[in-house]
Amino acid sequence: MNNISNTIKKPTYSTLSNKYGFEISISNYGASLTSLKIPLPSGKKIDVVLGFDTISNYKKSFELPSAPYFGAIVGRYAGRIANGNFELDGKQHQLFQNNNKNSLHGGKEGFSQKNWVVIDSKLTENSAVTLEYISPSYEENYPGELKIQVTYSLSESNELIIEYSAISSEDTIINLTHHSYFNLDGHTGTIENQNLMIASNTILETNKENIPTGSFIDLSAHAFNFNIPKKCPNSIDNTFVLTDSNIVSASLFSPKNNLKMEVITNQPGIHIYVGGNCFGKIKGKEGANYHPLSGICFETQNYPDAPNHYNFPSAILKKGERYYHKTIYRFQLG
């Protein structure tokens, strides 16, 4: 990659494309994916992720009672941490409580409201852009200075690849994810007639505040068994347990456009989200009036509240060790 060190703190955009006409745009604000345009056989291009036309609207969206986090990188810890509290190396850490008494998606600002820095870019075949954010020690009360790099790649096989890498100056906890809302009919449509598949036999059991109890729910006779594809649910906010990183973890299919998206990840879970109450407040891209069925999130990640459950995969990143997370969104037409 060419080193194009960028210390500009104001919002900037990077655009990547491939030989088939796929095009993505990434803002350094929240390292957010702001558009993902796919050419259909008809010649029409559709944007399959929700978002806003201006960075000011992205910022305003975080003032809503339930911020949508459109397209953002979420951290230092994605999902909820009960009471905003965890123990590490025998010491209690109290995080900012921004979701009732719990901490959600990193706290008051997290990584989604930071101006990241573009440090590398490749605009030829298999184009890519790498963004970096350095989180100071005890930002949001997380221990350790954490250097995070996120690389967005657009392959010539029509894959959006997101790779996350991080290293900490002290032992810390980490759980990064990507928060795009996908709609394969185009961002102005609805997902209600799209088919969802999730390769999972269990979900995390949660309490009324959506905090994991530490137990699991078998999906054999459950409405959220999506091993065989079926219509997207009207509302869902659940973490599905993944057991095999070598298979397609989830997929979404649009009969209207004959377009399929497959999700492959090395993470132990995928949080599926449809719904929310932030809609009708701010106009979406191209004047779109978004609603709870406008999009669906595929948040590949560790389990929420893992630091407080001995039987969940460890969320601890030891001093000097490397965190690595890779997720592929593969698109197929016809």
Where is each model-derived feature located?
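An exposed, glycine/acidic-rich loop-and-rim segment of catalytic or binding clefts
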Residues: 1-334
